[in-house]
A protein has these predicted regions:
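N-terminal accessory targeting/assembly segments
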Residues: 1-196, 207, 558, 566
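Flexible beta-alpha connector loops of hexameric P-loop NTPases
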Residues: 145, 310, 314-331, 363-378
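Conserved alpha-helical scaffold flanking the Walker A/P-loop in AAA+ ATPase domains
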Residues: 329-330, 334-341
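Glycine-rich phosphate-binding P-loop
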Residues: 242-274
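Conserved P-loop NTPase nucleotide-binding/switch module
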Residues: 341-385, 389-390, 399-429
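N-terminal pre-Walker A segment at the start of P-loop NTPase domains
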Residues: 208-243, 278, 286-302, 307-318
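Conserved NTP phosphate-binding and transfer environment spanning the P-loop NTPase/kinase superfamily
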Residues: 390-393, 399-566
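Carboxylate/His-rich catalytic cores and anion/metal-binding grooves
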Residues: 193-199, 203, 259, 266-297, ...
Length: 566
């Protein structure tokens, strides 16, 4: 391995040369306390920045093993280190001068959720650390300005590494608090199963966000307070007793007037599948990790999905036991989302009537009289929600503000009033008894068979050079194949879409053969990430900064990719 001085001499030698001479710097260089690896050099100062990684041995980094002795604690520590490093390098970005992206220092930007990312990887076997970042190699026009890169690599970067990536230089109490919070969050997740709960919201939690764009907690928001009848006290290993609202298994209805906090509560539950950083306000809002948000999704593609549990006898005799369309309606898309959610292994559905297809959710008595059940191909969700729980063990939490039909099938009814929850189950049931329940002649409940075996189309594998473009949190473009993920609401970070793009290509190139079922393909992808790490998905032609998506979002991506054949 070459030394840091070798790199400095090389940079001196290529100063004022044409930009491609920077390519000669690729390789690993030993600095006093870490190894610097120049992994990819940009083609010109206006292109995507160069990729650089910092490698620190476990002995030098010296993080105690109790900080990363479980997967969840390791991810939390990586997240903390990444935030510290990002904060440390930020003042130095663009301090070195030049054209285009010259002088840029960049790294993954973490949100409020704690996610596994390739930007910071701690090896659990030896404690070694790798941090991946991007640097804009400086130039004037397209002429190398290596004296500016020397400033970055020899003046700016070493100090940033020393301050933020070595245990002895960090606030050790803060590091321990990261581990303790993670232990408490995992203890709540374990308690959900033990106590028969779908979710837990601690008293004092701050659920509203600053705006629809900024995910920080809203200032002066009303802290959450559990109704006494739903209050559960959990004994956490570090914080001790914590009280809050436990939402039981079964069918839960959230009601209330407009703007009183129904959707805010549901959105907090959606994000409760992830752990949150200290100070977010939702640190102790924990939801069943497999929970899936359901909604209608006009125009999505559906391929060979058995939606006969909800849709049957379509005009034209379309086979709904193997239903396909390139342009789904609101009801067929939501039916497919339910079935695909079952296939993904979810134990909890989250539904807001505002984003649901009305004719999929319920039919009122007058409509039943005008349009007979025999003439209606849709079996509404209200006719299946009890069966989903009683026969498959899948609970549902629904937000409703206009239809009272679900009072008859709900186990628990929570009313939000001025952002405060009230348990009105008894009152709702008593009042509902005065009205006839929704009844309809429906077919017997039967569990769909999941035997779809995907194969990639030429749009994914037919090109010698794969081009991948991720558009925020909305969609993935691979070559000319667009996968629309705008309606997959539990994706929280654009790097999760990078991860999905890499997983989609990995599946298409190495996992799919037309014989393995979709479930088996996703199992193989998760096994690879568990055993080899998220970084095993990194490859030329794929995105470089990945965050791990959940199993449910992997299914959602594969189901929406129009280039897959089932």
């Amino acid at each position: 391995m070459q030394s840091a001085n070798d790199l400095k001499q090389l940079l001196f030698s290529i100063n004022h040369k044409s930009y491609p001479a920077y390519k000669s710097t690729r390789g690993a260089y030993q600095f006093p306390r870490y190894t610097l690896s120049i992994d990819h050099v940009q083609g010109d100062p206006f292109a995507a920045p160069s990729r650089v990684s910092v490698h620190i041995s476990g002995k030098t980094a010296a993080f105690p093993s109790f900080l990363y002795d479980t997967y969840e604690k390791r991810v939390a520590l990586q997240d903390y280190l990444l935030r510290q490093f990002a904060r440390t390098i930020a003042p130095y970005s663009f301090r070195a001068k030049g054209s285009g992206k010259s002088g840029l220092l960049g790294i993954s930007r973490c949100g409020q959720e704690i996610l596994e990312r390739t930007a910071c990887v701690l090896n659990p076997s030896d404690g070694s650390l790798v941090v991946n970042m991007e640097i804009g190699f400086p130039a004037n026009g397209r002429t190398i300005a290596s004296q500016e890169l020397i400033r970055i690599l020899f003046d700016f970067l070493p100090g940033c590494v020393e301050k933020s990536l070595f245990y002895r230089a960090l606030d050790q109490k803060a590091c321990a608090n990261v581990a303790r919070l993670c232990e408490d969050q995992q203890a709540i997740r374990a308690a959900l199963k033990e106590k028969g709960l779908t979710a837990f919201i601690a008293d004092g939690s701050i659920l509203p966000r600053e705006t629809g764009v900024f995910d920080l907690p809203m200032k002066h928001a009303v802290p959450f307070t559990s109704p006494e009848s739903l209050r559960v006290t959990l004994d956490l290993p570090n914080r001790g007793p914590v009280s809050g609202m436990g939402i039981p298994l079964g069918v839960t209805l959230i009601v209330g007037g407009g703007f009183h906090g129904k959707s805010t509560l549901l959105q907090a539950l959606e994000r409760g599948v992830y752990n949150h950083i200290a100070g977010d306000g939702r640190e102790y809002v924990i939801t069943d990790a497999s929970a899936g948000k359901l909604r209608s999704e006009d125009s999505r593609s559906i391929r060979n999905v058995d939606i006969s549990l909800f849709i049957h006898d379509l005009p034209g005799k379309s086979d709904t036991t193997s239903f396909s369309t390139a342009d789904a309606s609101g009801s067929t898309s939501q039916a497919a989302n339910v079935i695909e959610g079952i296939e993904s292994g979810t134990s909890l559905f989250l539904i807001d009537e505002d984003t649901s297809a009305t004719n999929f959710m319920v039919r009122d008595e007058l409509m039943q009289r005008v349009v007979a059940d025999s003439e209606e191909p849709i079996t509404p969700f209200i006719s299946r929600v009890r069966d989903l729980y009683e026969k498959l063990g899948i609970s549902s939490i629904l937000v409703a503000g206009s239809s009272g039909s679900y009072f008859h099938v709900a186990d628990t009814v929570i009313q939000m009033k001025e952002y405060v929850p009230y348990d009105i189950t008894d009152r709702a049931k008593t009042t509902a008894a005065e009205f006839p329940p929704f009844t309809a002649s429906v077919r017997p409940f039967s569990v769909p068979a999941f035997h779809r075996c995907p194969q990639p189309g030429k749009g994914l594998t037919g090109s010698d050079r794969t081009k991948v473009k991720v558009m925020g949190q909305e969609s993935i473009l691979i070559n000319k194949s667009l996968t629309d993920l705008r309606a997959v609401e539990q994706l929280t970070d654009s790097e999760q879409l990078n991860g999905l793009a890499a997983l989609l290509l990995e599946a298409a190139e190495h996992k799919m053969d037309g014989k393995k079922t979709l479930v088996q393909v996703v199992d193989l992808l998760e096994k690879q990430m568990d055993e080899k790490g998220l970084a095993s998905l990194l490859a030329p032609g794929r995105p470089s900064d990945l965050a791990r998506p959940r199993r449910q979002e992997i299914f959602a991506c594969l189901n929406r990719c129009r280039e897959l054949r089932f």
